[in-house]
Amino acid sequence: MEELDALLEELERSTLQDSDEYSNPAPLPLDQHSRKETNLDETSEILSIQDNTSPLPAQLVYTTNIQELNVYSEAQEPKESPPPSKTSAAAQLDELMAHLTEMQAKVAVRADAGKKHLPDKQDHKASLDSMLGGLEQELQDLGIATVPKGHCASCQKPIAGKVIHALGQSWHPEHFVCTHCKEEIGSSPFFERSGLAYCPNDYHQLFSPRCAYCAAPILDKVLTAMNQTWHPEHFFCSHCGEVFGAEGFHEKDKKPYCRKDFLAMFSPKCGGCNRPVLENYLSAMDTVWHPECFVCGDCFTSFSTGSFFELDGRPFCELHYHHRRGTLCHGCGQPITGRCISAMGYKFHPEHFVCAFCLTQLSKGIFREQNDKTYCQPCFNKLFPL
């Protein structure tokens, strides 16, 4: 097929030669196009690849940032014209080649006699037209189209053999290539962007959104979160690695976390149980508390009056606060909030520091001790004589 195309181009150039060429005619280089041992099916093959007029969207589902102008197309498989029978076609091709050889000899003879006799310009043109007409008829008899199927959008040359129709234009198959890698696309699927064709691999590498986790192009479903795009399987908790469910996620320092881990790691902790505080809470002693956890550290009684006493970072009721401080009256067992008397390692309300026998207040602070009890001097002398 390529030899016949070259022959047609050579013959067309011959018809356009001016009068200067007749003064020294050169033989057509037909010897360069000798017949090859090829199957007639290959010689007479006609391929027409039709383009879909309504290309599919580039990203079919779940994409959020692929522009609508990106188009995914697929050219139809090549279709061949029914070839003539091998026997008759081979005979016609032999006859055609013999005719061309004869014409070559005639042109060579005219070249040798060019100095003695210059052929008439009209006779030469008529001869070439006749030869071309006969060649076109014989090619048509073989089922080979002699009228160009259009001009290639890449090289701008006529297309006489296989043709691809894509992007609203015609192409030589070898010239319909990926804009980026220059690999031949042929009838393979391709993507269109801004009027240019791309193979699927290059299109995704150049234009598809990329996963914020693995940085690879996202070819199918895409998840958008935190102003980034992700493969759905790559959007998971930064702590436990679990993929997020219907409950969603929480963000901290530009990282996603599931609810459980987020609360465990970043929510305020109760000062009593050290568990996350989610709803109602109390704020005291520079921390937060579950209401049920804010109780006395000894008796676990809640502070109904709203007042409490702090000791070593823990809340206490008044009684147990003074008990831990050692400020309970040894006489009545109640907290001492005012003046007190210290004796025998204990503290007493002044009114409760009395003689254990006569109950007289030891106001002067003079007393006698016996068996961990206080006595005034007269009672002590009576009860414990020497």
UniProtKB/Swiss-Prot annotation:
Macrophages, monocytes and osteoclasts (at protein level). Strongly expressed in cells and tissues of hematopoietic origin. Highest expression in lymphoid tissues such as spleen, lymph node, thymus and appendix and in the vascular smooth muscle. Lower levels in bone marrow and fetal liver. Also expressed in peripheral blood lymphocytes and a number of hematopoietic cell lines. Very low levels found in epithelial cell lines. Expressed in prostate cancer (PCa) cells and its expression intensity is directly linked to PCa progression. It comes from Homo sapiens (Human). GO terms for biological process: cell adhesion; endothelial cell migration; negative regulation of B cell receptor signaling pathway; negative regulation of cell adhesion; protein-containing complex assembly; regulation of cell adhesion mediated by integrin; signal transduction; substrate adhesion-dependent cell spreading. It holds the Pfam family LIM. Residues 150-208, 209-267, 268-326, 327-386 form the LIM zinc-binding domain. Transcriptional coactivator for androgen receptor (AR) and serum response factor (SRF). Contributes to the regulation of cell adhesion, spreading and cell migration and acts as a negative regulator in integrin-mediated cell adhesion events. Suppresses the integrin-induced tyrosine phosphorylation of paxillin (PXN). May play a critical role as an adapter protein in the formation of the adhesion zone in osteoclasts. Negatively regulates B-cell antigen receptor (BCR) signaling. The LIM domain 3 is critical for focal adhesion targeting and the suppression of paxillin (PXN) tyrosine phosphorylation. The LIM domain 3 alone or both LIM domains 3 and 4 can mediate interaction with AR. A motif (LD motif 2) lies at residues 70-82. Residues 13-41 are annotated as: Disordered. It is found in: Cytoplasm; Cell junction, Focal adhesion; Nucleus; Cytoplasm, Perinuclear region. This is Leupaxin. The modification N-acetylmethionine is found at M1. A motif (LD motif 1) lies at residues 3-15. The modification Phosphoserine is found at S19, S54, S81. It comes from the Eukaryota. Phosphorylated on tyrosine residues. Phosphorylation on Tyr-72 is important for its inhibitory function. Bombesin stimulates phosphorylation on Tyr-22, Tyr-62 and Tyr-72. A motif (LD motif 3) lies at residues 92-103.
